[in-house]
A protein has these predicted regions:
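The feature captures the beta-strand-to-loop junction immediately N-terminal to the Walker
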Residues: 36-38
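Helix-to-loop junction immediately C-terminal to a conserved catalytic motif
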Residues: 51
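Conserved ABC transporter NBD signature motif
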Residues: 59-66, 79
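Conserved ABC nucleotide-binding domain
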Residues: 69-70, 125-146
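Conserved ABC ATPase "signature" region
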Residues: 115-134, 161, 182-185
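Catalytic Walker B motif of ABC-type/P-loop ATPase nucleotide-binding domains
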Residues: 163-167
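A short, surface-exposed alpha-helical micro-motif characterized by mixed small hydrophobic
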Residues: 204-206
Length: 245
């Protein structure tokens, strides 16, 4: 087993609220790990702790065998951890191309890039996600589905080893969801390990090698999708009651 990322007893408190409660798991190289759970379970908080946008109260985040708990988000990006955000805030006055170039400039090896090189890399990732036709438009002109593609392209331009995806399929129709699934699988084929939060259960089931389930900040299940989704605790978490014989 070759783990690229490990979370050890990670805990986050917001004053009196225990948002993440001593959660441990590992993401293997070239794996897609689905992170699911009801609203308020702590999923986005978890990837914020991994990416460095939040600081843990306790526990460790280990990346390629080294603790990164005390590193700020930009240093984690330099190492090769990138994420998308559930609430998309592109730079509205920049073109779509230059939004993605920002990711290229501030990701792994980005500090040595010149703008033209970053734009060339950005163009390749726009083609990868199917957004190259809008490269010269201002980002503020994009609709919801295309903003999600932009978020993904910007994260990929950082040259990540680990990609954290936060509900990139929310609000999409069936055809758009299938397109995003195809893109995510192509990302994994590039050798990138992926932790993905998603509420579209059919999509997450077909995408993921394994599932991790949170409820009220606690890990309640982990394993292959079929066994996890038949777990009594998982059923209770989503339905609000245990299934009786």
């Amino acid at each position: 087993m070759d783990d690229i990322l490990e979370v050890r007893s990670l805990t986050k408190r917001f004053q009196g609220l225990l948002a993440i409660d001593h959660v441990s798991f590992a993401l293997q190289r070239n794996e897609i790990l689905g992170l699911i759970g009801p609203n308020g379970a702590g999923k986005t908080t978890m990837i914020s702790l991994i990416s460095g946008t939040l600081e843990p109260s306790e526990g460790e985040v280990i990346f390629e065998g080294v603790s990164i708990r005390r590193l700020p988000a930009y240093r984690r990006g330099r190492l090769g951890i990138a994420r998308t955000f559930q609430v998309m805030r592109p730079f509205p006055d920049l073109t779509v191309l230059d939004n993605v170039a920002v990711g290229a400039l501030f990701g792994a090896t980005g500090h040595s890039q010149v703008l033209q090189d970053a734009r060339e890399r950005a163009q390749r990732w726009l083609e990868f996600v199917g957004l190259d036709r809008r490269a010269q438009q201002r980002a503020e002109s994009l609709g919801g589905p295309d903003r999600k593609r932009l978020e993904l392209a910007k994260a990929l331009a950082m040259r990540p080893k680990v990609l954290l995806l936060d509900e990139v399929m929310a609000g999409l129709n069936h055809v758009e969801i299938e397109e995003v699934i195809t893109v995510i699988k192509k990302v994994r084929d590039q050798g990138i390990s992926i932790l993905v939060i998603e509420h579209v259960m059919k999509a997450i089931q077909s995408l993921s090698d394994r599932l991790l389930v949170l409820r009220n900040g606690e890990k309640i299940a982990e394993g292959r999708p079929q066994e996890v989704l038949s777990n009594e605790q998982v059923i209770a978490a989503y339905l609000g009651t245990k299934r009786h014989e």
